[in-house]
Amino acid sequence: MRLEVEDFLRALNIEPIVLSQQPSSGKTIIEKIEYYSNVGFGVVLYTECDVGAKKGSLNHRYRARQNVVFEHGFLIGKLTRNRVAALVKGNVETPNDISGVVYINIDESEQWKNELKKEMRVVGYNV
């Protein structure tokens, strides 16, 4: 999914910065977000990486890794809500107590591409 999103952004003449591909130079992921936060828009990928449930419940659901959720919130703090979109692949639980956060579902119809472009246009991207 990451590669597909990268290719899509490049097709729009936007060069993505993929934090996991950048040199760490001894930085934590939060320090890398701070270092690379001079950007106009952020995209976070929520994928079925973990499984979790409320204590005492047998209703387990897929979740993005908890560090992804934290980093998503941190990125919103740096860029503001309207400059960050989360792409959700699969049946992934998303935090439901953060109002105004944009979650875009990825499915076979590839409608996510139009949704992401729409969000980027609102903040001034000519895509």
Residue positions per predicted region:
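Conserved N-terminal substructure of TIR/SEFIR domains
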Residues: 1-42, 78
